[in-house]
Amino acid sequence: MALLTNGKGFIRALEKSGSLAVYAPLEGGFEGRYQRRLRTNGYHTFSLTARGLGDVSAYLMGVHGVRPPHLGKKNIGQEAAVGPVYFVPPIAAYQLETLPPKSKGLVLWILEGFILSQTELEYLANLPTLEPRLKVVIELGGERYFSWKPLPEVIKVA
């Protein structure tokens, strides 16, 4: 059980700053270990990739419209020329609503965060101040060992 009780420095840093930039070895495996450590400390984790997020604020915290691919079929005169709009609930806000009462909060673990723009990273760094039960971990690149830094510090350097 010692494997599950380690990682307290990571959890303390996440609770202190609210958002972390993570650098993990490219062969993988470390993400699952640290997510398991978060879950044993009372957090719920939600993994998603940064590719295809679109408007990060709308996708995570607001109801947003999505147009599915039309696949060559069009309804003439009934809908918009670009197709119907389906409204999707916000991913993070919905997960926060369904958290158990004894949970410490929700950790969004975002893969491939290196493709996000500076503005999107700033929004994700400020998101825990808007919603205190929400923490953010973004994988920003590879390293020979698992390391992390507070996301606001990484944004200031860039």
Swiss-Prot record:
Name assigned to this protein: NAD(P)H-quinone oxidoreductase subunit N
Homology family: Belongs to the complex I NdhN subunit family.
Location in or out of the cell: Cellular thylakoid membrane
Uppermost EC category: translocase
Catalytic reactions on record: a plastoquinone + NADH + (n+1) H(+)(in) = a plastoquinol + NAD(+) + n H(+)(out); a plastoquinone + NADPH + (n+1) H(+)(in) = a plastoquinol + NADP(+) + n H(+)(out)
Alphabetized UniProt keyword annotations: Membrane, NAD, NADP, Plastoquinone, Quinone, Thylakoid, Translocase, Transport
Signal peptide positions on this chain: none
Subunit record text: NDH-1 can be composed of about 15 different subunits; different subcomplexes with different compositions have been identified which probably have different functions.
Function: NDH-1 shuttles electrons from an unknown electron donor, via FMN and iron-sulfur (Fe-S) centers, to quinones in the respiratory and/or the photosynthetic chain. The immediate electron acceptor for the enzyme in this species is believed to be plastoquinone. Couples the redox reaction to proton translocation, and thus conserves the redox energy in a proton gradient. Cyanobacterial NDH-1 also plays a role in inorganic carbon-concentration.
A Pfam family that the UniProt record links to this protein: NdhN
Enzyme Commission designation: 7.1.1.-
Domain of life (superkingdom): Bacteria
Membrane topology designation: Peripheral membrane protein
This protein's GO CC annotations: plasma membrane-derived thylakoid membrane
Alphabetized PANTHER family for the sequence: NAD(P)H-QUINONE OXIDOREDUCTASE SUBUNIT N, CHLOROPLASTIC
HAMAP family reported for this sequence: NDH1_NDH1N
Entry's Gene Ontology molecular function annotations: oxidoreductase activity, acting on NAD(P)H, quinone or similar compound as acceptor; quinone binding
